[in-house]
């Protein structure tokens, strides 16, 4: 099953299109985030009704829930969004588009913190109406300083680099480099693949961000 988490404003399309792009099956859940107070409740209610009607035409056995989020306290809103994400069942799909910015910003923060719990992040473009999948960086990753030097060496290469090359450049044992690369991959900072019997390593988006946070980029 899937649980979709999405803000909703007055436009049902920003919710419906991302859901349809990922699929909808019996037992799936839709959790729509709204501010706990709003100036035009009627328009919001109409948008929620449109979502429910359109999705029920496709799959009647879908649960739709409205979650009320604090809009005037950023920290409280982040924690509320956090609870929704970690309490969701199945594959969690977070839509970072639509709705009030007062809800979207806290949801984005919570989604980045809990990226390991999210199967997919998507967004609905206000410009061209396209639904795009977003790469979710593991911003909570943490590795020892001696392993960071291996990450830096990977980043020094524009393209992929082989583990034998890293062993030579860093003047370390093959077993040490293998351990470092395995740890970095577990943290989502690099990705690897085999070319024959040789493993090649490539920096990920999360790895690039990690080095910027760490002050090494």
Positions of predicted regions on the chain:
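Long, low-complexity, Lys/Arg-enriched
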Residues: 1-91, 106, 112-217
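Short glycine-rich phosphate-binding loop at a beta-alpha junction
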Residues: 91-97
């Amino acid at each position: 099953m899937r649980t979709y988490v999405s803000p909703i404003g007055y436009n049902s399309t920003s919710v419906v299109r991302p859901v349809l792009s990922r699929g909808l099956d019996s037992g799936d859940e839709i959790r729509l985030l709204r501010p706990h107070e709003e100036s035009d409740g009627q328009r919001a209610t109409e948008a929620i009704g449109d979502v429910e009607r359109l999705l029920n035409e496709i799959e009647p056995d879908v649960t739709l829930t409205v979650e009320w989020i604090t809009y005037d306290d950023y920290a409280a809103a982040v924690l509320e969004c956090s609870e929704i994400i970690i309490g969701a069942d199945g594959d969690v799909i977070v839509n970072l588009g639509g709705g009030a910015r007062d809800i979207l910003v806290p949801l984005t923060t919570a989604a980045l913190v809990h990226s390991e719990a999210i199967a997919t992040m998507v967004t609905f473009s206000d410009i061209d109406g396209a639904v795009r999948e977003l790469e979710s960086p593991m911003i909570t990753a943490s590795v020892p300083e001696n392993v960071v030097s291996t990450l830096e060496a990977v980043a020094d290469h524009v393209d992929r680099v082989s583990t034998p090359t890293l062993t030579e450049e860093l003047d370390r044992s093959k077993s040490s480099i293998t351990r470092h690369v395995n740890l970095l991959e577990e943290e989502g900072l690099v990705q690897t693949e085999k070319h024959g019997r040789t493993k090649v390593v490539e920096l990920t988006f999360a790895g690039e961000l990690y080095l910027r946070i760490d002050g090494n980029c």
